Design a protein with these regions (language model features):
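Class I S-adenosyl-L-methionine-dependent methyltransferase catalytic core
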Residues: 2-187
Length: 187
């Protein structure tokens, strides 16, 4: 049974200082090798990118900011999501909802921040969390299209699956080097 309660809402606080321009704050894209690693590790072929734009989507079907993934119908069974990091809580709640109520498998790429309510929601509802160690993901700058080393937090992959038994969370760890090596060697 999922921990998500009907109509449950929270207010999230932004507590991390960043040098990123406010206009670009939530526009950093996932490197392809991270996406490919997630597909390989979880044995999933994603068919929906739930938080993307035309120029950075990882699959053909995607939900743009204008379409609003928090309200849009998710037309996919295996969903990838790298949500805006300024306020991930509503996206975590939406991923849990889609998994529990609509039989979707969702993998989220999130910061590691054990002090937040959304992290607690992940721990309570996810089937697996993969912590990325040894370095931080060099996200793709929205303006330049290049990987950047300006990331100031570690990341994790969070797997939500339908009918995952409550309290069955598995924690795993992968070094960024291994992740990149395996992600680049797919196909």
């Amino acid at each position: 049974m999922a921990y998500l309660l009907k109509n449950q809402t929270y207010k999230a606080k932004m507590m991390t200082k960043s040098n990123t321009k406010k206009s670009d704050k939530d526009l950093w894209a996932t490197p392809w090798w991270v996406f490919h690693y997630a597909e390989k590790y979880f044995s999933i072929k994603f068919d929906l990118d739930a938080c993307a734009m035309q120029h950075n989507t990882k699959v053909k079907k995607f939900i743009s900011p204008e379409q609003d993934t928090l309200t849009a119908d998710w037309q996919g069974r295996y969903c990838w999501m790298n949500p805006p990091y300024s306020n991930p809580l509503p996206f975590v709640l939406r991923a849990i909802q889609q998994s529990v109520l609509h039989n979707k498998t969702v993998v989220m790429l999130l910061n590691v921040d054990g002090s937040t309510k959304w992290f607690d929601m992940c721990v309570r509802n996810a089937k697996e969390i993969v912590y990325i160690t040894n370095s931080r993901i060099p996200f793709i700058n929205n303006e330049t299209g290049e990987e950047t080393d300006q990331n100031n937090k570690p990341q994790m992959l969070v797997l939500f699956e339908p009918k995952a038994p409550y309290g069955s969370l598995k924690s795993s760890y992968v070094s960024l080097h291994t992740m990149k090596e395996q992600g680049l060697n797919t196909k």
